[in-house]
Amino acid sequence: MKIKKAIIPAAGLGTRFLPATKAMPKEMLPILDKPTIQYIVEEAVAAGIEDIIIVTGKHKRAIEDHFDNQKELEMILEEKGKSDLLQSVKYSSNLANMFYVRQKEQKGLGHAIWTARQFIGNEPFAVLLGDDIVQADTPAIKQLMNQYETTGKSIIGVQQVNEIETHRYGIVDPEESYNELFSVNKFVEKPEIGTAPSNLAIMGRYVLKPDIFDYLERQEIGRGGEIQLTDAIEHLNSEDCVYAYNFEGERYDVGEKIGFVKTTIQFALKDDYMKKEITEFIKSINK
């Protein structure tokens, strides 16, 4: 079955970016001239996703407004002859069929995914988390979709990380592999330093069969007092093989401040308009 739907969880409090996120959704913080969540939506659209449901929470209305039509703004831009800006505004309003559901309680990623179950129905679906922007010739989520079409099994996107970073991620304990596709012995959510079974970290891209909702509904509270998606995937894997796929692409961590700043600089250095001036500025402060 073709994958046409995607879930983007965006209900988190964004505490790492306080006080900036006290009144503004973390997902609306910009990398250059686009909010981070737009990069995620664009990846889904480039992969052929048609319907996107964003799981939001309190004080997240700005996300809905961003992907909605802004007729008054469009009229002003048209009257002033600012055609480039007009096109960019219209573009963000027409990326995909956008839907929204609110996660009323902060019960974790697994609960956020479960909240969107009525939208998904009995179809396989994609999940894209907003903490990582991935640039690749083939969109990261599309790579996973291709693997799903081949195997018919749930696929978890992974990439290698340094051993000292494994405690920050869900980690897979891989078994057999074929062309970067791994069967998995177990999934470990944020292992203690020095205890990780590998350096293959789960990187916020998933293609899941709808069976996962049954496991999420029964899932007990896990690490951090939350319903963990990784725990539900572990139970699914015990009854129906779940694969990990080491996808290609350059990953940018925008889920914490240092990574966010690095990403902004890296994107600026790739921008034709900004590259020269930013390069000269960096040289000037390093003298």
From Swiss-Prot:
Q: What does the record give under GO molecular function?
A: UTP:glucose-1-phosphate uridylyltransferase activity
| Listed pathway(s) | Glycolipid metabolism; diglucosyl-diacylglycerol biosynthesis
UniProt-listed Gene3D superfamilies? Spore Coat Polysaccharide Biosynthesis Protein SpsA, Chain A
Reaction catalysed by this enzyme = alpha-D-glucose 1-phosphate + UTP + H(+) = UDP-alpha-D-glucose + diphosphate
Q: Which GO terms describe its biological process?
A: enterobacterial common antigen biosynthetic process; UDP-alpha-D-glucose metabolic process
Q: Which SUPFAM superfamilies match?
A: Nucleotide-diphospho-sugar transferases (SSF53448)
- EC number(s)? 2.7.7.9
Identify the keywords attached in UniProt to this record, alphabetized: Carbohydrate metabolism, Nucleotidyltransferase, Transferase
Q: Which InterPro entries match?
A: GalU_uridylyltTrfase_bac/arc, NTP_transferase_dom, Nucleotide-diphossugar_trans
Q: Which family does it belong to?
A: Belongs to the UDPGP type 2 family.
**Which function does this protein serve?**
Catalyzes the formation of UDP-glucose from glucose-1-phosphate and UTP. This is an intermediate step in the biosynthesis of diglucosyl-diacylglycerol (Glc2-DAG), i.e. a glycolipid found in the membrane, which is also used as a membrane anchor for lipoteichoic acid (LTA).
Protein name (Swiss-Prot/TrEMBL): UTP--glucose-1-phosphate uridylyltransferase 1
Can you name the source organism? Staphylococcus saprophyticus subsp. saprophyticus (strain ATCC 15305 / DSM 20229 / NCIMB 8711 / NCTC 7292 / S-41)
Q: Source taxonomy lineage?
A: Bacteria, Bacillati, Bacillota, Bacilli, Bacillales
